Amino acid sequence: MAVEILNESGIEVPEDALLRMARHVYARLHVHERAETAVTVVDAARMAELHEEWMDLPGPTDVMSLPMDELTPGSPEAPAEGVLGDVVLCPEVAAEQAARGGHSRDDELLLLLTHGMLHLLGYDHVEDAEREEMFTLQDRLVSEVLGRPAPAPTVED
C-alpha cells in the first residue's frame, strides 16, 4: 500500500507508527493494495494557511482530509482502489489536545490520522448515527494498533 509520510513541520513525529496505522486502516477497511495516500505533517502556521484556504476557517486545526478519488471501504473480494488523497496533521495542535485529554501526543497523532483517513473513505460525524459509527470504528482501529484502549477523542466537531 502506497503511504507516504512527509514531515514538513520541523518537529519529530513517530513516522513508523503513523505508517503502521495508515496501513492498518487500509487493510481493515479493504482498501486495495495499490491505493495511495500522503500523510503530511505541518507546523501550526502552515496548518492555519491550509485551514483558511480549504475550509475558509481561521487558525490551525488538528487534522485535515483532502480527498482525491471518491473511495469507500471495499470488501475482501473487491477492495477499493484509487488515490485516497492527503491527510494533513499538525503536531502542535495534537500536543495541546493530548495534554487536555491526558494522553501522549503520539497517541493523539494516531487518533487524528485514523480520523482523517476515515473522512477520506467517506465517513462523517455530522449526524448522531454517523458520529457513533465513525467514532466506534476509529476507536477500534486505534486500539488494535496500540494493543490497548485508544485515547478518547479530544477534538470538538
Curated annotation (Swiss-Prot):
Keyword annotations from UniProtKB, A to Z: Cytoplasm, Endonuclease, Hydrolase, Metal-binding, Nuclease, Ribosome biogenesis, rRNA processing, Zinc
Note accompanying the cofactor annotation: Binds 1 zinc ion.
InterPro entries the record matches: MetalPrtase_cat_dom_sf_prd, YbeY, YbeY_CS
Matching PANTHER family: ENDORIBONUCLEASE YBEY, CHLOROPLASTIC
Annotated binding of Zn(2+), by residue: H115, H119, H125
Protein name in UniProt: Endoribonuclease YbeY
EC code(s) of this entry: 3.1.-.-
Function comment: Single strand-specific metallo-endoribonuclease involved in late-stage 70S ribosome quality control and in maturation of the 3' terminus of the 16S rRNA.
Pfam family name, one: YbeY
Superkingdom, taxonomy of origin: Bacteria
Localisation: Cytoplasm
Cellular component GO terms held in the UniProt record: cytoplasm
GO molecular function, one term: metalloendopeptidase activity
Cofactor dependency: Zn(2+)
Organism encoding this protein: Micrococcus luteus (strain ATCC 4698 / DSM 20030 / JCM 1464 / CCM 169 / CCUG 5858 / IAM 1056 / NBRC 3333 / NCIMB 9278 / NCTC 2665 / VKM Ac-2230) (Micrococcus lysodeikticus)
